UniProtKB/Swiss-Prot annotation:
Mg(2+) 1 binds at D14, D147. The lineage of its organism: Bacteria, Bacillati, Cyanobacteriota, Cyanophyceae, Synechococcales. This is Crossover junction endodeoxyribonuclease RuvC. It is found in: Cytoplasm. It comes from Synechocystis sp. (strain ATCC 27184 / PCC 6803 / Kazusa). Its main location: cytoplasm. Its cofactor is Mg(2+). The gene is ruvC.
Amino acid sequence: MDQTEAAQRWLGIDPGLAIIGWAILDGQPDLSAHLVDYGIIETSKNLSTPERLVEIEQDIHVLLEEFSPQAIAMEMPFFSRQIKAAGGVMQALGVINLVIYREKSIQPVFLHQSSWKCHLGNGKANKAEVAAMVQNFFGLEDLPIDDSVDAIAIALAGLNGVRNDIG
């Protein structure tokens, strides 16, 4: 992309069943990035998995309608020991992927956690370190240390061309 091209809008997603982080960035690869908005989607543990998935579907629909992203980057979770959690997260990931494709015909870029963290400078950074790097990059005074921070970093990595051979 050259400097004369318009900025592209990216949606970054840190998927989960209980909490989904999301962030919207506008920018051009390696030139500029503007943080438009970010937040989390939470589903109640008191709901059944199908009810939580419906809530996720509806909330992702709202994000897509409100922000109209042109590209999407999502973390591809890795599970080594948390097999029970993996099922719910992968179901949520499937619903998110379905809604994105159904409504925007976009195939998300899937990134391993170590890939998007390396883009910030430390592939093993914890959430507080990721928050500090994101806060510094965007010149933010305050930033919550939650899943939205990861989503900001995921969107930034996607915007700047980080890719994995997965998907």
